[in-house]
UniProtKB/Swiss-Prot annotation:
Mg(2+) binds at residues 65, 138, 141. The lineage of its organism: Bacteria, Pseudomonadati, Pseudomonadota, Alphaproteobacteria, Sphingomonadales. Belongs to the ribonuclease III family. One of its GO terms (molecular function) is metal ion binding. Its main location: cytoplasm. It comes from Zymomonas mobilis subsp. mobilis (strain ATCC 31821 / ZM4 / CP4). This is Ribonuclease 3. It catalyses: Endonucleolytic cleavage to 5'-phosphomonoester. SUPFAM superfamilies: dsRNA-binding domain-like, RNase III domain-like. NCBIfam families: RNaseIII (TIGR02191). Homodimer.
Length: 246
């Protein structure tokens, strides 16, 4: 179990009391955690907090997400280190970055049925936060953080190994980042480096949508959307690579 001298969360009595009152009688929520995440909550309010978006109130998932992100990274990094003993650091890093990405975490969140339990403010719900990869990825990491706090790295690792296994074993080779691949294509064909431009930014602050265009002079261009500039750039680079491969 995690040592709470180091990992304990700061709580506020009135908020904690309200959270516990709201969840203690919700057997369906507790049963869902036990069935899908393999963990019986000792403190249901901790897991309710992991499901609470900042738009809903003060006691939200952000601190738990911060912790869960590090736990996920450590477990995956150790897994890859053991699984691919001959791979250099660069290839391991590319595998890791793909496996802990927001899109990967969001895909797991959907598999376990997490969206139905999200606690969102009205505006966030109306804006589609329940379908946002950013939000779902963060909440999945927050749940990992909550399990770590209650039962330690072994319990969190068991969950991660169960749901990330298809992603880990599905990587036949270390994935090359689309932006790097496009850069290499341009260099190999004596072209100028790709240029990325922001076409637009729409949506609310908690669920933005960026449209990015990438172009290689004299070759072509492609556009794509993403919930962050980096995500949109990656998608645009992949779109242009797909065009070049035709």
């Amino acid at each position: 179990m995690a040592d709470k001298r180091f990992f304990g969360t700061k709580t506020f009595p009135n908020q904690e009391k309200a959270l516990k009152a709201k969840i203690m009688n919700n057997d369906a929520f507790i049963s869902w955690i036990e069935k899908n995440l393999g963990h019986r909550p000792k403190d249901p309010a901790l897991f309710l907090r992991a499901m609470t978006h900042p738009s809903h109130g003060n006691s939200d998932y952000q601190r738990l997400e911060f912790l869960g992100d590090r736990v996920l990274g450590l477990v995956i990094a150790n897994w890859l280190y053991d699984l691919f003993p001959r791979e250099p650091e660069g290839k391991l890093s590319r595998r890791l970055n793909s496996l802990v990405s927001g899109a990967s975490c969001a895909s797991i969140a959907r598999i376990v049925g997490l969206p139905q339990w999200l606690r969102l403010g009205k505006q966030a719900r109306d804006d589609g936060a329940a379908a946002s990869d950013n939000v779902l990825g963060d909440v999945m990491e927050a749940m990992i953080g909550a399990i770590f706090l209650e039962s330690g790295i072994e319990a969190a690792g068991k969950l991660i190994h169960k749901y990330w296994a298809p992603l880990v074993t599905g990587q036949e080779s270390a994935p090359k980042h689309p932006k790097s691949a496009l850069q290499e294509w341009a260099a190999a064909h004596n072209r100028r480096p790709p240029v990325y431009e922001i076409v637009s930014r729409t949506g609310p602050q908690h669920n933005p949508c960026f449209t990015i265009q990438v172009s290689i002079a004299g070759v072509g261009e492609a556009s794509a959307e993403g919930s962050s500039k980096q995500e949109a750039q990656t998608a645009a680079a992949q779109a242009l690579l797909d065009i070049l491969a035709q």
